[in-house]
From Swiss-Prot:
The keyword Zinc-finger does not apply. This is DYE-linked aldehyde dehydrogenase, alpha chain. Its cofactor is Mo-molybdopterin cytosine dinucleotide. Binds 1 Mo-molybdopterin cytosine dinucleotide (Mo-MCD) cofactor per subunit. It comes from the Bacteria. Active with aldehydes and formate esters as substrates. Its EC number is 1.2.99.-.
Length: 24
């Protein structure tokens, strides 16, 4: 219950190295 790292393969978003941090 904080943040999680999701690969762009799961969510088509690009920020750094093909991953982004989603605040929950």
């Amino acid at each position: 219950v904080g943040t999680r790292v999701v690969r762009i393969e799961d969510q088509q978003l690009i920020t750094q190295g093909g991953t982004y941090v989603e605040d929950l």
